[in-house]
């Protein structure tokens, strides 16, 4: 007997568990491919042809992060890689990652990591920090 596992209904569509996994993975891929841009989670949900409220809930259930928070964490991870692995200035990195301003990037980075970007760069190079792939 074939049993269908139904997870949710969104925009009058029935999604099986495998379909949900696929939508979440598609969203994660799109976010990773666009880390140097600004992504609106509502537009991303529309692109995936699902409602934003459903997308936000299911994405958080699967990843532990709301879509916007997940994307912010991707950007911070990329910033860490660039700080340790390149000689680009903090200003260049903040611009590349599409932050509103260098000050905003600096403040957010310090709040999330406990280090300023320059402290992180220095510490990371001294200790050969490798960012874990948790996202």
Q: Locations of the language-model features?
A:
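Short, small-residue-biased leader/transition segments that mark boundaries at the very start
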Residues: 1-2
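Short, Lys/Arg-enriched N-terminal segment that forms or immediately precedes the first helix
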Residues: 10-13, 62-63
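Intrinsic-disorder/low-complexity linker and hinge segments
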Residues: 14-21
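Terminal helix-turn-helix DNA-binding modules in bacterial transcription factors
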Residues: 25-33, 37-38, 42, 61-106, ...
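Short coil turns linking two alpha-helices in DNA-binding domains
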Residues: 47, 51-52, 100-101
């Amino acid at each position: 007997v074939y049993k269908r596992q139904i997870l949710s209904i969104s925009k009058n569509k029935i999604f099986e568990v495998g379909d949900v996994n696929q939508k979440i993975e598609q969203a994660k891929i799109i976010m990773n491919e666009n880390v140097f841009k600004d992504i609106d989670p509502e537009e991303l949900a529309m692109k995936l042809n699902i409602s934003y409220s459903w997308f936000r809930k299911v994405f958080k259930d699967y990843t532990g992060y709301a879509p916007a928070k997940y994307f912010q964490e991707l950007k911070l991870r990329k910033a860490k890689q660039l700080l340790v692995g390149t000689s680009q200035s903090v200003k260049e990195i903040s611009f590349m990652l599409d932050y509103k301003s260098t000050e905003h990037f600096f403040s957010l980075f310090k709040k999330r990591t406990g280090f300023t970007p320059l402290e992180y760069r220095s510490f990371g190079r001294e200790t050969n920090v490798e960012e874990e792939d948790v996202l």
